[in-house]
């Protein structure tokens, strides 16, 4: 009986984790965190370095951050915002998104995935993403 109950609880936890990962409340599945550290001059802030790979047909939902995000395009691709013509986000270009300013919402429409290196300087202890509805 205990084994069955443990298995049931484990299954429910796995299901909840899967649902959480598939909803905007969680992290982006395309993002791989490389490093995270406290900002030495401001202990209530942290620096997060990540690589993201967004495949053809994948969409990054509109969101903002509790701090600044800066990035570099490692591999460019054609992207499209809703209601707009496709545009090239070129390899070697950079970007910066300011605190609490919604951005993204694009879909990769080119033949190759888009690869980004991002650095976030954000409020420590808060979620990295604030999803825009």
PLM region descriptions:
Residues 62, 71-72, 94-97, 117-120:
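Structural recognition of the beta-strand scaffold that forms the well-ordered cores
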